[in-house]
From Swiss-Prot:
Disulfide bonds join C243-C252. GO terms for molecular function: hydrolase activity, acting on ester bonds; lipid binding. It comes from Mesocricetus auratus. Pfam families: Abhydro_lipase. The active site is at S170, D340, H369. Glycans are attached at N268. Female-specific protein which lacks detectable lipase activity against a range of substrates. Binds the hydrophobic lipid 1-aminoanthracene with high affinity. GO terms for cellular component: extracellular space. This is Tear acid lipase-like protein. Induction: Repressed by the androgen dihydrotesterone (DHT), the estrogen estradiol (E2) and the thyroid hormone triiodothyronine (T3) (at protein level). The keyword Protein biosynthesis does not apply.
Amino acid sequence: MSWLLSTMCLVHVCGNIFCLFETTTNPEAYMKVSKIVNHWGYTSEEYEAVTEDGYILPLNRIPHGKNNINSTAPKKVVLCQHGLFSTAGVWVSNPPSNSLAFILADAGFDVWMGNSRGSTWAKKHLYLDPNSKEFWAFSFDEMIKYDLPATINFILKKTGQKQIYYIGHSQGALIALGAFSTNQKLAEKIKLCFLLAPIATLKHVEGIVSLLPYFYPTAFKVVFSEKEFLSAVAFSKLHGYSCNAKVINDGCVAIFLSMTGYVPQHLNKSRVDVYIRHSLAGTSVQTLLHYRQAIKKGVFEAYDWGSQSLNMLHYNQTTPPLYNVEDMKIPTAMWSGGKDSLADTKDVAHLVPKISNLIYHKITADFSHLDFTVGKNAYYVSNDILKLLDKSETENLH
């Protein structure tokens, strides 16, 4: 057990180790999402959606591309939702030619980027202190039940649209599967659902995350507290110091890829500081324990409160209810990778037959988990998405 604790602790605090070295960084590593958008010459807007349980979620918007600034025609709306540990910044972490949000904006779409509770920019609440245990008492259940509905409904109200397109990566795919299968009114507001590196069941997960089942929840809470895990405060020090020095940079890359799938040739090492800033942004310990549960049990279900009596209190049954993915009827397109250690090919194969209205599924043999968002070849996926969006409008796929 000691070596497992050591490994997880290394990931948790290594940002403090790298702060001993100095180097230059990419300017975007210091920027909020809106500033990155402006940095590349695009118009940026910021909003806040308030969830039913009081969390304040930032929304970043690119209302138009560089070449359609003066267009008055109503634009189709796309919501991009980030994955585990990430922020909305993951969609703009590369230059415009290889960042999905910029590509969509230049193609004429009104692009919105959501931020899940507990990530770097989403640590505000109407009345809870972000330093309190109460603020961090959430898992992906609350993202499914509260975050996604609040985000989508805000966008619809602001744009006047009745439906939007949804793109979710990793956890962004998971909360879509959960929300759109349990909330049919919300599902009706989605034209087409795009899932990148989708996770639901995690039985075959590999890498550092696969160690989670070896931790008892009580011990995990003692070691990492009951608040935030993988704080961006620690990891963001990487973007201000040593991740461009060759030896240390290689260490950064190794840690970065150890959680997602090791295909280093797909990663632009000169931008690792930006990726770490926006792709290692923290979450709650309870969320991580929920993933531990999913890995250990191999099912997509609500959070297990640890006893039959507590489950009965929360769910009116002694065991956590399952998320029945089959109940999601939205036309869905999926992309998965053969080198993905989180969305393993065996888990994806288990998920595929449960997608009731799967219109497209592409497996890229050499893609890892993050290749779909920040990889050098991410534009291949962007091109596929644009083709399906065009087909959706012309052939009425939804």
